[in-house]
């Protein structure tokens, strides 16, 4: 099927035809007559010259209107029926009529305010230029086509006018709302006439949203009549308002409050009218059948009914008045625009358009299919109408009475509105005036009514008409400065129009947020326009393509495509954007050398989700991906040349995101607008939570670096709802020749673009370097002329270099075969992956989901490429995605090339941070850019540097990205190099956006460059889709294993894949555990062999994490460490090199000397001055660790430091180390020879210079490589130190020698060991000679140096094989002989009193010697009353510790009894009790008298537990007569020699033994007798002794607790006293003490 050569005749939908249909049928023109609309030119109210020019321009406009009306009559049809206006108001009114009226109301005040701000003096000169420009224009004016609701809209507008006339605030201006509206467009939108004429000649419609104007003729007449007062108002009020500008700003809030009530009343009227329209729309749109082929106009008007929301009719009335304003007052001149821009720049610093989001110049017309499917709907149509009307009326009411905001509203709404009218007509024969914007190209023309059927989207390649490919060219201009408004002429006007953007779906914006954002955006627009920098900055999401000519020869045209900064939630704008992309990709083929680069910035994720929902039907049929799809993706499909493989995206298994609806187009067969409305209900709420800025690239080239207007950014601006500002302002030059079409994928053309921006004498170099574009476009190389313009008193200069761009020939085939899609609309094979394995659009969209979510607090460019000095592009631990065109894409950023082509950079290494965000006000903050740029080194996430290389991607086994840039890298001295952070992050999005927000810790770099030839992908912030994508699609593609054998507990993605683990919280191990050092080595070897930058990053991370926790083991390989360091250096990872080297030095793993030299070479080559201090520190650590570089190495290091421009202090540090090493080297030269060293020892001995001998020891230790030779030297030293006995010298040689050695900085444990062994030899030597004092001095110095010699052996003589016991005995004996018992005990304690053990065997003689030595020590200590030390020595006698050494135990009994007696005498009951226990335990004979004395002393001291224990021990040893025979006979025999304590203990045993009988019921009849036995000793005892014993017995009964009572009974035959124990006291005692007494006396522990 061939596309129609001319667009089908638009017709209105059945049942919705209005007065417009009648007008069309009778062939009447829809626009008012010149006499009606241009009435302002009939009466001369100003100067005569001005009136004459006005009349002339009105006549031209009138002629244009008539001509185009005739043309329009030829191509349009009118329905037969023509209802009278007002007869069918409820049924035929538009869906959002009330909102349209509010929009008109808003635009009126905006227009009036701006008109009054124009300077009177600028009118004359502007009129002259205007006349000249008008002569070049077509005399045709676009006809206004009225399709519906004329009468209703007219009535509503007039009623709205009445409301405004009653407003006291505006009565002073004597202007009705209609007049104000006309004035607003007269003042600055005269530029529409230019673009309008050109577009009409070319048969294009110059409307961003593809919607035609609709207005009622009568309403237009009434409005244009009021224009006659405009000229007078202009001249008289301009100066007044300019003077009172600041006062108006200050009174803004007051005015807002005063008119709030009246505003709400106006909004209520609109709300009621919208309610009436709701049901009529639903009634008219039901029951319609889908027709496969329909006329273009029929589809358009039905598409309006389908999904057109409040914005549609809102735009109708606005553009009606816009058109009238342009016709009625054509005499406004070019100077108006200049003054307008100047005034606007000043005003936008403070305020914003109050209802800019409501003034949407969208109309119902030919290309309204863009709105038919993508307007953001509410959950139900009814709720949408109510909410829209309410919010619009409230917002309007709150803001309409702020006169200051009139000025600001012009920047984003009214100025742009004329570009919305694109009537169809014949192309103009004048080729030099073909100046239509990219978005004006005709796109899809098929619209389906609201019947639930599919709707062809705007950018469907199946519905492109032949006219859409017609090209126009910009006229050759000879102006020297395109930034000068006086020379820009029509193209500057066109850019001015299209720079303005729309904001549909106004209720999504909070007023405060909108004010801030629109203020910033409006300011950016006109500042950048004056500086010849194409800039787009606004909250509105409509993509506008701006063309601005920059003269560069007669044949040169510079088109400046600017893209809207962001995309707000509205899906309607997304369709327009994608439509513009399609038009640019296909429509520019015939344009001579001109191709605008489209730049599309994708909104936050929530906005994307909403847009995806609205585009469900679009993606199903038009084979276009979601909003994340950019033009290169479409180009990739076109370049393949295989339309049979043209895929429609499909994302199945959605995991819950409503925003992914558009990718599931195959799940449902019918998508009616009501269904879309329902599906989008959940997404609407998310539109208010847009917190992310995701900048992507759209258009023929997906990767471009643009000149950026410096701005200031604030982090909080990213929380604004639906507020996104374009951070890029671009200008590109194209040749005036036909594009070279290149079909093969991968063909890249390199071009350079350098940008130098000078701001207030601060020159910043923004080096945009080399850039290889995709094979889709190929352009002739052309250099831009420098552009200079003044912005708020500041000069900005831009030097843009040449660009190359190519188009493939496949566009021709694409244009011819656009209707092939029509027959495969429902083909299920279109969804999925092709047979060749190429990813379809669905999988391509899914590929985006692999990328992690960007932190919501910070904006980020989706495509960043970081660079460190080197040939390869360094990777960083942050995730990055390379945006690739279908071909191999290479973008290199090099130092900016001036006229001399020499690299230049900030001498301080400060990189400029070029940013533009929502709240950026460029003019106010240009002076702060210098500080901001320097702060960006540490604060920004993306830092621009002097050179960056984005390498082209190659697919290999390991997905290694190799850099093809073989050029030398410029040295950059910024701190980024020293810190080794990302030296350059170049956004591959159109703006060179360098965000100043670096708060988040960056996640590890785990993303790859995509394989060449695949479609470019963008970041999709959806981790759920990411998981699905990994699971189903490309897990194997992107995660190829490296072939490592990894244990199960380790993360295989982290260790065994190139990209690493992407899990947010991985349950597997990412760092090897202790004992898995072999795994570390294997991983390092593999990563080194692969030699990929990210793997080397990972290897450094694993090395640092592992060896910070665990010391190196047997599997550690020094060669692997060296190889790792070399690989890191090759990839310019200096930070990781420093970290690994420092850790290796701390862990005693010294890398090779060549590694250190290579580091110095790298730092010197890159001139990294800031890295020198850290490198010097590492060098010193190397020297301290024992590395001795050669003198030539040191000289080379000094040379490299000079090359790196190191300071003199740093170089001096190396020279000092060199001098020290030279001294050591000299010593090494003569000490490495062992013979010469030994001879030197003899010399020291002869001279008695033991200090020199110590220094010689240190030198030998540092220079000797063989430890055996060093031990031989130490033995020689030991012999030398022990052969000076012949000479009578007071000092001890060993002491001087040991002190010298201990002062060495390298003094270590090895030195302690050697000194201890030499000291043992000296001790033995003095022990043999009985030189106790000298021997003790040796022992003292060993004690001071904390050398544990007791575990060592000597170096020479018998002490070399002496057992440990012998060495300890010798040392202890020396201490004893020298009178130091403490020293002797210290030596014994140091040896842990060990004699002979399996580990330290010794002879019996040594054991006996130890026993005698200890006994001697105990005897001496006991004499000093040191009982504790004596007992410690005695209990460590040989034999007590080891039973095998049981010898001479009886010999030690005397010492123990002496110690026990001495302790009792001194009342040391604790030690005496311990001694008694030890003697009983070790069966050492104990003197009973000492034991009885101990028991008595313990009892008298109330230590009853110990007394009872020792009493039981004494009973068992036989110290007391046995009691068993008499106890149970109720008779107790008590010897008279016992003490009262012993008697009481005996009575206790007696009571416990007879407790059962005593406590029995018949016990009172029994008698317990105690007999005080006389002693049967040879020594006769006197009467007094026995009498004392009787008293002790009575005392024993009394001291018991409770007391016992005894009675004297009789005297037996042996004259022994017999006593009876009172029964009651015995019972009482048992009752209280039986528990513990039974345990103590009835149960023995022996």
Swiss-Prot record:
Name of the gene: Topaz1
Upper lineage: Eukaryota, Metazoa, Chordata, Craniata, Vertebrata
GO CC annotation terms, alphabetical: cytosol
Region Disordered, residue ranges: 1-90, 407-439, 850-877
Keywords for this protein: Cytoplasm, Differentiation, Spermatogenesis
Compositional bias of kind Pro residues: 1-11
Protein name (Swiss-Prot/TrEMBL): Protein TOPAZ1
InterPro entries membership: TOPAZ1, TOPAZ1_dom
Composition skew (Polar residues), residue ranges: 409-420
Stored Pfam families: Asp_Glu_race_2
Organism annotation: Rattus norvegicus (Rat)
Function: Important for normal spermatogenesis and male fertility. Specifically required for progression to the post-meiotic stages of spermatocyte development. Seems to be necessary for normal expression levels of a number of testis-expressed gene transcripts, although its role in this process is unclear.
Primary subcellular site in the record, as a coarse category: cytoplasm
Top-rank taxon: Eukaryota
Bias (Basic and acidic residues): 63-74, 429-439, 853-863
Localization terms from the record: Cytoplasm, Cytosol
GO BP term, example: apoptotic process
């Amino acid at each position: 099927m061939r596309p129609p050569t001319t667009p089908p005749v638009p017709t209105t939908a059945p049942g919705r035809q209005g007065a417009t249909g009648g007008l069309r049928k009778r062939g009447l023109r829809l626009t008012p007559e010149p006499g009606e609309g241009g009435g302002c030119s009939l009466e001369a109210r100003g100067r005569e010259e001005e009136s004459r020019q006005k009349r002339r321009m009105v006549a031209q406009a009138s002629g244009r209107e008539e001509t185009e009306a005739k043309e329009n009559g030829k191509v349009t049809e009118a329905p037969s029926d023509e209802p009278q206006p007002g007869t069918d108001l409820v049924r035929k009114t538009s869906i959002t009529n009330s909102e349209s009226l509010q929009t008109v109301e808003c635009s009126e005040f905006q227009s009036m305010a701006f008109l009054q701000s124009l300077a009177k003096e600028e009118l004359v000169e502007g009129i002259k230029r205007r006349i000249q420009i008008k002569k070049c224009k077509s005399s045709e004016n676009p006809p206004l086509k009225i399709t519906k609701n004329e009468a209703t809209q007219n009535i509503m507008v007039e009623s709205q006018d009445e409301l405004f006339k009653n407003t006291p605030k505006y009565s002073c201006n004597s202007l009705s709302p209609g007049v104000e509206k006309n004035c607003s467009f007269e003042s600055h939108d005269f530029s529409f006439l230019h673009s309008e004429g050109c577009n009409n000649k070319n048969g294009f419609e110059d409307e961003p949203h593809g919607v035609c104007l609709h207005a009622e003729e009568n309403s237009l007449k009434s409005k244009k009549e009021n224009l006659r007062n405009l000229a007078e108002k202009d001249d008289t009020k301009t100066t007044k308002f300019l003077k009172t500008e600041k006062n108006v700003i200050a009174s803004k809030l007051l005015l807002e409050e005063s008119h709030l009530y009246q505003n709400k009343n106006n909004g209520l009227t609109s709300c009621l009218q919208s309610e009436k329209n709701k049901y009529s729309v639903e009634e008219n749109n039901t029951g319609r059948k889908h027709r496969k082929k329909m006329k273009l106009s029929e589809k358009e008007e039905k598409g309006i009914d389908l999904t057109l929301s409040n914005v549609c009719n809102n735009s109708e009335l606005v553009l009606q008045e816009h058109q009238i304003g342009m016709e009625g007052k054509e005499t406004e001149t070019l100077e108006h625009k200049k003054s307008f821009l100047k005034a606007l720049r000043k005003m936008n610093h403070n305020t914003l358009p109050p209802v800019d989001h409501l003034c949407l110049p969208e109309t119902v017309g030919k290309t309204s299919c863009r709105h038919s499917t993508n307007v953001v709907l509410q959950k139900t149509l009814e709720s949408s109408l109510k909410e829209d009307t309410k919010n619009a009326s409230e917002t309007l009411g709150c803001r309409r009475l702020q006169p200051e905001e009139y000025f600001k509203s012009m920047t984003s709404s009214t100025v742009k509105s004329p570009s919305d009218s694109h009537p169809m007509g014949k192309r103009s024969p004048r080729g030099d005036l073909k100046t239509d914007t990219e978005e004006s190209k005709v796109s899809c023309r098929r619209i389906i009514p609201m019947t639930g059927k599919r709707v062809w989207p705007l950018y469907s390649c199946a519905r492109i008409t032949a006219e859409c490919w017609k090209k126009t060219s910009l006229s050759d201009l000879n102006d020297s400065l395109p930034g000068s408004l006086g020379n820009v002429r029509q193209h500057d006007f066109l850019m001015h129009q299209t720079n303005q953007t729309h904001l549909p779906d106004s209720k999504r914006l909070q007023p405060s947020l909108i004010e801030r954002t629109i203020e910033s955006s409006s300011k950016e627009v006109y500042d950048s326009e004056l500086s010849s920098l194409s800039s787009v900055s606004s909250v509105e999401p409509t993509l506008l393509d701006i063309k601005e000519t920059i003269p560069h020869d007669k044949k040169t045209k510079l088109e400046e495509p600017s893209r809207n900064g962001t995309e707000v939630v509205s899906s309607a704008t997304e369709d327009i954007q994608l439509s513009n992309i399609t038009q640019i990709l296909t429509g520019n083929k015939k344009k001579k050398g001109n191709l605008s680069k489209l730049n599309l910035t994708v909104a936050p994720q929530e906005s994307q989700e909403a847009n995806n929902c609205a585009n469900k039907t679009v993606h199903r049929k038009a084979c276009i991906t979601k909003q994340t799809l950019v033009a290169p993706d479409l180009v990739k499909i076109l370049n393949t040349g295989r339309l049979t493989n043209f895929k429609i995206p499909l994302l199945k298994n959605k995991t819950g995101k409503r925003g992914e609806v558009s990718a599931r187009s195959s799940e449902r067969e019918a998508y009616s607008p009501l269904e879309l409305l329902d599906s989008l209900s959940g997404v609407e709420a998310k539109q208010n939570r847009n917190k992310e800025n995701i900048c992507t690239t759209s258009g023929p080239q997906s990767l471009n670096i643009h000149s950026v207007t410096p701005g200031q950014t604030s982090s909080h601006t990213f929380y604004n709802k639906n507020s996104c500002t374009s951070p890029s302002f671009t200008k590109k030059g194209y040749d005036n020749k036909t594009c070279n079409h290149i079909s093969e994928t991968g063909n890249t053309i390199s071009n350079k673009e350098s940008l130098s921006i000078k701001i207030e004498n601060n020159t910043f170099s923004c080096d945009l370097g080399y850039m290889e574009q995709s094979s889709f476009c190929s352009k002739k190389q052309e250099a831009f002329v420098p552009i200079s313009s003044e912005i708020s008193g500041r000069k900005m200069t831009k030097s843009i270099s040449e660009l190359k761009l190519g188009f493939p020939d496949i566009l021709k085939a694409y244009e011819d075969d656009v209707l092939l899609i029509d027959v495969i609309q429902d083909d299920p094979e279109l969804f999925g992956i092709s047979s060749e394995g190429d990813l379809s659009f669905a999988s391509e969209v899914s590929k985006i989901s692999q990328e992690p979510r960007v932190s919501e607090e910070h904006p980020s460019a989706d495509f960043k490429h970081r660079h460190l000095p080197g040939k390869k592009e360094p990777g960083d631990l942050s995730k990055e995605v390379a945006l690739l065109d279908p071909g191999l894409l290479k973008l290199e950023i090099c130092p900016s090339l001036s006229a001399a082509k020499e690299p230049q950079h900030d001498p301080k290494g400060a990189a400029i941070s070029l940013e533009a965000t929502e709240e950026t006000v460029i003019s106010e903050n240009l002076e702060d850019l210098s500080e901001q740029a320097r702060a960006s080194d540490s604060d920004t996430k993306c830092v621009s540097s002097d050179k960056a290389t984005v390498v082209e991607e190659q697919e290999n086994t390991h997905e290694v990205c190799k850099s093809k840039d073989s050029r030398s890298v410029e040295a950059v001295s910024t701190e980024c190099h020293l810190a080794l952070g990302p030296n350059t992050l170049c956004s591959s999005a159109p703006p060179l956006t360098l965000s100043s927000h670096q708060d988040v810790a960056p996640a590890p770099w785990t993303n790859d460059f995509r394989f060449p030839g695949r479609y470019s992908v963008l970041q999709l912030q959806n981790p759920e889709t990411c998981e699905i994508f990994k699971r189903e699609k490309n897990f194997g593609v992107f995660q190829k294993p490296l072939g490592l054998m990894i244990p199960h507990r380790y993360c295989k993605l982290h260790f065994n894949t190139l990209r690493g683990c992407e899990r947010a919280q991985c349950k597997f191990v990412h760092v090897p555990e202790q004992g898995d050092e072999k795994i570390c080595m294997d991983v390092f070897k593999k990563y080194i062999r692969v030699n990929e930058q990210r793997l080397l990053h990972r290897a450094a991370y694993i090395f640092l994490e592992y060896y910070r926790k665990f010391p190196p083991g047997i599997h550690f390989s020094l060669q692997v460490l060296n190889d790792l360091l070399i690989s890191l250096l090759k990839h310019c990872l200096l930070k990781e090199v420093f970290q690994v080297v420092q850790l290796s030095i701390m862990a005693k793993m010294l890398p090779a000397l060549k590694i250190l030299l290579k580091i110095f070479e790298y730092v010197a080559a890159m001139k990294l001055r800031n890295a020198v201090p850290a490198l010097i520190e590492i060098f010193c650590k190397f020297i301290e660790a024992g590395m001795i570089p050669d003198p030539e190495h040191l000289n080379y290091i000094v040379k490299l430091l000079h090359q790196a421009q190191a300071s003199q202090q740093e170089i001096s540090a190396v020279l000092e180390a060199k001098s020290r090493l030279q001294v050591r080297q000299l010593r090494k030269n003569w000490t490495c020879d062992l013979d010469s060293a030994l001879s030197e020892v003899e010399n020291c001995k002869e001279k008695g210079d033991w200090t020199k001998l110590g220094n010689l020891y240190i030198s030998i230790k540092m220079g000797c490589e063989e430890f055996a030779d060093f031990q031989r030297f130490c033995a020689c030293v030991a012999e030398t130190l022990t052969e000076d006995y012949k000479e009578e010298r007071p000092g001890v040689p060993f002491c001087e020698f040991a002190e010298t050695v201990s002062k060495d900085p390298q003094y270590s444990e090895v030195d302690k060991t050697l000194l201890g062994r030499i000291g043992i030899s000296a001790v033995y030597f003095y022990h043999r000679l009985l030189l106790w004092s000298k021997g003790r001095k040796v022992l003292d110095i060993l004690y001071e140096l904390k050398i544990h010699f007791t575990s060592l052996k000597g170096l020479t003589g018998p002490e070399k094989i002496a057992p440990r016991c012998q060495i300890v005995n010798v040392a202890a004996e020396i201490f004893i002989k020298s009178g130091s018992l403490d020293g002797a005990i210290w030596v014994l304690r140091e040896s842990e009193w060990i004699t002979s053990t399996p580990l330290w065997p010794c002879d019996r003689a040594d054991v006996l010697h130890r026993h005698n030595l200890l006994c001697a020590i105990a005897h001496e200590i006991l004499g000093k009353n040191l009982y504790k030390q004596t007992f410690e020595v005695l209990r460590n006698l040989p034999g007590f510790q080891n039973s095998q050494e049981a010898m001479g135990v009886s010999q030690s009994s005397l010492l123990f009894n002496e110690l026990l007696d001495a302790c009792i005498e001194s009342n040391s009951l604790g030690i005496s009790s311990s001694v008694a226990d030890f003697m009983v335990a070790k069966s050492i004979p104990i003197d009973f008298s000492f034991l009885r004395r101990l028991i008595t002393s313990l009892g008298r001291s109330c230590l009853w537990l110990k007394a009872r224990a020792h009493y039981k021990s004494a009973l068992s040893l036989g110290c007391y007569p046995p009691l068993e025979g008499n106890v149970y006979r109720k008779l107790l025999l008590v010897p008279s020699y016992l003490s009262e304590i012993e008697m009481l203990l005996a009575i206790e045993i007696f009571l416990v033994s007879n407790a059962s009988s005593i406590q029995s019921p018949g016990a009172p009849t029994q008698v317990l007798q105690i007999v005080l036995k006389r002693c049967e000793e040879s020594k006769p005892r006197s009467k007094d002794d026995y009498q004392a014993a009787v008293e002790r017995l009575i005392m024993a009964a009394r001291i018991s607790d409770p007391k016992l009572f005894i009675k004297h009974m009789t005297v037996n035959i042996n004259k022994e006293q017999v006593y009876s124990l009172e029964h009651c006291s015995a019972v009482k005692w048992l009752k209280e003490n039986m528990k513990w007494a039974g345990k103590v006396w009835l149960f023995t522990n022996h």
